[in-house]
């Protein structure tokens, strides 16, 4: 804890799931309730976490992050359900987004495939059907960051980039802090300190 901070799996991988859910939904978390566990002998920090989320406007969510789940290799998964339908995306199958409108059959939307929009095309580096994902996502971030730096130096136009900022980092720290406070209060709901 002296070097890693308050969160184990929560700080390592949970913050990414938290940020992804907030970014994709466009919603901010108001309160959460967390149950943190450590299954490894002698571990001071969590290696498994279950978190109930209450978003602004009444939306609800659940987050599970674990570093002790055999058979799941960085199994980041995001599911969103609303009044119009649902979305389901898994990092282990990153080129496919499952989209289901209420009362209709599920559609599989492929990365940069038919019906993709301009944002999808801009983020894709190879044609549809070729594997692409994790490393290319970092390349997109670095490329956008470099373009923003060049623009700030007057050496180009400011790109239409979507990058995480300091606010996202602060929000991630507030998320870990709230989870630890909740767990220490027997899983009581607590507000994020912003």
What do these predicted ranges mean?
Residues 1-2, 121-129, 150-157:
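Short glycine/proline-rich turn/loop motifs
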Residues 1-43, 49-53, 97, 122, ...:
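Predominantly a Rossmann-like dinucleotide-binding segment in NAD(P)-dependent oxidoreductases
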Residues 5-10, 127-134, 158-166:
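Active-site rim elements
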Residues 8-11, 15-19, 136-143, 167-177:
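A structural signal for well-ordered alpha-helical segments within the folded catalytic domains
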Residues 36-46, 56-140:
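NAD(P)-dinucleotide binding in Rossmann-like oxidoreductases
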Residues 48-49, 160:
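Short loop/turn microsegments at loop-to-beta-strand junctions
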Residues 143-194:
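C-terminal helix-rich "cap/oligomerization" subdomain common to oxidoreductases
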């Amino acid at each position: 804890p002296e070097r890693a901070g308050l969160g184990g799996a929560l700080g390592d991988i949970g913050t990414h799931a938290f940020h992804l859910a907030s970014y994709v939904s466009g919603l901010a978390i108001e309160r959460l309730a967390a149950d943190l566990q450590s299954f490894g002998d002698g571990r001071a920090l969590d290696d498994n976490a279950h978190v109930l989320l209450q978003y602004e406007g009444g939306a609800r969510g659940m987050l599970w992050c674990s570093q002790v789940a055999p058979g799941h290799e960085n199994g980041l998964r995001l599911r969103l359900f609303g009044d119009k339908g649902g979305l389901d995306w898994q990092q282990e199958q990153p080129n496919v987004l499952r989209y289901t409108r209420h009362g209709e059959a599920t559609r599989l939307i492929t990365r940069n495939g038919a019906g993709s929009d301009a944002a999808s095309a801009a983020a894709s580096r190879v044609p549809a059907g070729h594997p692409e994902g994790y490393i290319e996502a970092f390349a997109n971030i670095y490329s956008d960051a470099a373009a923003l730096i060049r623009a700030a130096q007057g050496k180009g136009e400011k790109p239409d980039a979507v990058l995480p900022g300091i606010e996202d980092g602060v929000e991630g720290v507030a998320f870990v802090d709230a989870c630890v406070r909740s767990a220490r209060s027997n899983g009581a709901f607590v507000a994020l300190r912003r």
